[in-house]
């Protein structure tokens, strides 16, 4: 995970970074190593970046990592009612999202999560930064909704969850999240 000591720089990093954005180490022994943004952790304001294990072995605290932030403001042609956030357009294209005969977008999610299982992150002022957690200790819910089988990169539908202007419950709304 990465974080700038400068609060305003870190807020910009958290706000503008999108999953799938390219990241490159530009100082230190791992200079030139490339990775990509995988998410954020709002509680500690860290941007999460994947690098190969051998590159991580050459990194040290204080190395500078350049994130090519791209994707906030992404729009889907013909679907002005859909709000995209926090995703690199190149990654978005790889998700296999299709438009059906009725003009409705179909997203290949692996499961649906009901609003009552969404926890930490609810009530945040914006969904453009931070994270949003599926939270349950209920073994039956874990099995019923396939939570126990989720993997990094899986797409999930969040039922009755609206993230347009912060995170909130809104009956009949849907949000798509990436694990």
Please place each PLM-identified region on the residue numbering.
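Conserved mixed alpha/beta catalytic, RNA-binding, or beta-rich assembly cores of soluble enzyme
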Residues: 1-179
């Amino acid at each position: 995970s990465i974080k700038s000591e400068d609060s305003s720089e870190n807020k910009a990093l958290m706000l503008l970074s999108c999953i799938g954005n390219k990241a490159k180490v530009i100082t230190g022994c791992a200079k030139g190593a490339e990775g990509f943004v995988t998410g954020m952790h709002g509680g500690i304001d860290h941007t999460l970046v994947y690098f190969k294990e051998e590159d991580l072995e050459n990194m040290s605290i204080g190395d500078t990592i350049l994130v090519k932030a791209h994707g906030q403001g992404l729009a889907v042609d013909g679907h002005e009612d859909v709000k995209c956030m926090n995703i690199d357009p190149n990654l978005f294209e790889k998700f296999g999202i299709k438009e059906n005969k009725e003009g409705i977008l179909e997203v290949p999610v692996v499961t649906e999560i009901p609003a009552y299982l969404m926890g930490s992150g609810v009530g945040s002022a914006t969904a453009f930064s931070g994270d949003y957690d599926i939270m349950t200790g209920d073994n039956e819910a874990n099995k019923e909704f396939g939570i126990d089988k989720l993997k990094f990169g899986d797409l999930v539908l969040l039922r009755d969850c609206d993230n347009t202007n912060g995170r909130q419950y809104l009956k009949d709304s849907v949000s798509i999240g990436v694990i």
